[in-house]
Amino acid sequence: MASQEISSLDEIENRYRGFLFDAYGVLLDGSGLIPGGAQVWHDLRKRGKSCWILTNGSSRTPEQATAAYRQMGLDVNLDEVITSGSLLPRYFEEEGLKGQITCVLGTAATFELVQKAGGIPCGALDQQDYSVVIVANQTEFPLLDTLDAVLTHVCRRVEAAKPCYLILTNPDLIFPKADGVYGFTAGSLALLLEAGLKLRLGKDAPPFAKLGKPFAPIFAEAERRAGHKNLLMIGDQLETDILGANNYGMDALLVGTGLTRIKPGMQLVPEPRYTLREWRISAC
């Protein structure tokens, strides 16, 4: 089925009981709120619609992310923010990783999230015999030295027949830093590590467990909070927002305000249920 182009979210609003908004590229970018996006969010909430921010960002705790969104002018509550990092406690519980020394490639907030999950966080250069690696962000550590250290440590553990668990909270490869300005993020670091580990270890290379979009755990958390699956995913990236929703059995709307610029006749793969070139604010 070809994507349906709409001119306003009003056209399809009543088909859904809840809405999942990506953050960067949909509601905001590195310069602040995206014009129109925040107003659509506010209008939906005023009309009694359930809304959540569903973001791969894991450089902040949910509390910090909520405070940052509010400071930008977005009216949002803590229970409306689902970050990929906030999935760590459930994952550590399910996989029996509590009490494990955990190497963190991320921010101070990521260390805090690991502690809340029951892990014992450390840096890659701390000379700890860690058994868990979490790739969450690309800042606040020396990039190349850290990747070299993690590659070496994981290879040594696997070759010594010791368990090693790799977790990627944020599978995004790039992100919009500002209008027309892009940067690499955590998913790209994991790609480098995966390639290096596969080259050295072959079939014994441990895979990354991926928690954020387009993978199922973050959508499952949204469904758990909503209590149903009648949700519309609104995103700007085909490879994360749209693919993830499609795979999970949710409808998706691609908004052309972020990484994917929608042009007439453009073939979109994967294909969203709807497309919207830019945010338009209803008169009511």
Task: Please report, for each region that a protein language model flagged, where it lies by residue.
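Asp-based, Mg2+/Mn2+-dependent phosphohydrolase catalytic module
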Residues: 1-49, 58-82, 89-284
